[in-house]
Amino acid sequence: DQIQAAYDAVLLDYIKRHDIELKPNWHFSGCSFSKYTDQVDVLDNKMTMQYHTDFIISERDMPGSKFQLTCTMYINDNYDGGDIEFFVNGDIINHKPQAGDILVFPSDDPYFHGVKTIYNGEKFFVRNFVMYTFPGTKEWLDNQLKFGAYRWAKEELKRIEHDDPR
């Protein structure tokens, strides 16, 4: 698959440049094709997608797949708006993707990012994530055993709703 081959090449370069050690429990999430259009609801601050990280902080202690690196390939650039904007350590970094660009960045804090509104046309992109399998913290697993899986899941959902601003 050409898209996966492009991701592999860019990720290997990124990993070498940033001296990242590949872990045996890392894997790809799988590609998802998406688009933003000028028909998407525009929020008050002119962002189509609000600032966020792809790592879900509220689920950090739970077992399961977690986001490590965000990888986005841009298919076209014949649209107006749609810049990706990073808010990193208090600085705003704006990038207008060009067709063929692949952006790779850590999925967690401090790499908050959002997408500006499309004013004309459609923006097509392919998203993929490098994920890792996390067994869960000892505390989380102990509580699941102590309270039972069903009750603990309900308690965690309450905590997530309280802790996660999304």
Regions found by a protein language model. Give the residues of each.
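Fe(II)/2-oxoglutarate oxygenase catalytic core
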Residues: 1-102, 110-166
